[in-house]
Curated annotation (Swiss-Prot):
Protein's UniProt name: ADP-sugar pyrophosphatase
Gene: NUDT5
Positions of modified residues (Phosphotyrosine): Y74
Phosphoserine carried by residues: S3, S10
Positions that bind Mg(2+) 2: E112
The species this protein was found in: Pongo abelii (Sumatran orangutan)
Span(s) of short sequence motif Nudix box: 97-118
PTM annotation (N6-acetyllysine): residues: K207, K215
Cross-link (Glycyl lysine isopeptide (Lys-Gly) (interchain with G-Cter in SUMO2)): K42
């Protein structure tokens, strides 16, 4: 990013935004040049992407972790596969979407889950607003965990709305290996949130890493 000569103000290490200049705006996103003060008192600029749809809610959208529970079956994580033009190919993701004006994150999560997968569930927990790619955008989401009763009649044959997505259910206890297999077979990309979740499951169930003894 561009930088300018240091100013005489703000030499105490505090960083803050000075100004934001609109460069280009489309229907869904806009590009801005953000001018800010770095810890040394130098004025710098940063190119930032922001959504045009943000309202008064605390986050732009929701990402749903749907846990499908059925009697005598392993728990499964319900994912969606869809074509993403910016990636130029297919991606595996959590069901997700923007929060409508006046809608709670929990309500948005249940709505998006049903629209994309056809499943109906119950909210187990909802995270605070968390950032997604802070080096590029100010976009934030609530991560909402939803449990799905697979024994319920309404979830026996879920009917998602036609959104050009494929619903994939993978065993929770083998999620990372199944994702790696799909990547190798279909040459798609896994969303970082999904892969991080799979890695966390693996690490949580694995033996602690051995720390080698130091030799003196």
């Amino acid at each position: 990013m561009e930088s300018q000569e240091p100013t005489e103000s703000s030499q105490n290490g505090k960083q803050y935004i000075i100004s934001e200049e609109l460069i280009s705006e489309g229907k869904w996103v806009k590009l801005e040049k953000t001018t800010y003060m770095d810890p040394t008192g130098k004025t710098r600029t940063w190119e930032s992407v922001k959504r045009t749809t943000r309202k008064e809610q605390t986050a732009d959208g929701v990402a749903v972790i749907p846990v499908l529970q059925r009697t005598l079956h392993y728990e499964c994580i319900v994912l969606v596969k869809q074509f993403r033009p910016p990636m130029g190919g297919y991606c595996i993701e959590f069901p997700a979407g923007l929060i409508d004006d006046g809608e709670t994150p929990e309500a948005a999560a249940l709505r998006e889950l049903e629209e994309e997968t056809g499943y109906k569930g119950d909210v187990a927990e909802c995270s605070p607003a968390v950032c997604m790619d802070p080096g590029l955008s100010n976009c934030t989401v609530h991560i909402v965990t939803v449990t799905i009763n697979g024994d319920d009649a309404e979830n026996a044959r879920p009917k998602p709305k036609p959104e050009f997505v494929e619903v994939i259910s993978l065993p929770k206890n083998d999620l990372l290996q199944r994702l790696d297999a799909l990547v190798a077979e279909e040459h798609l990309t896994v969303d970082a949130r999904v892969y991080s979740y799979a890695l966390a499951l693996k690490h949580a169930n694995a033996k602690p890493f051995e720390v080698p003894f130091l030799k003196f």
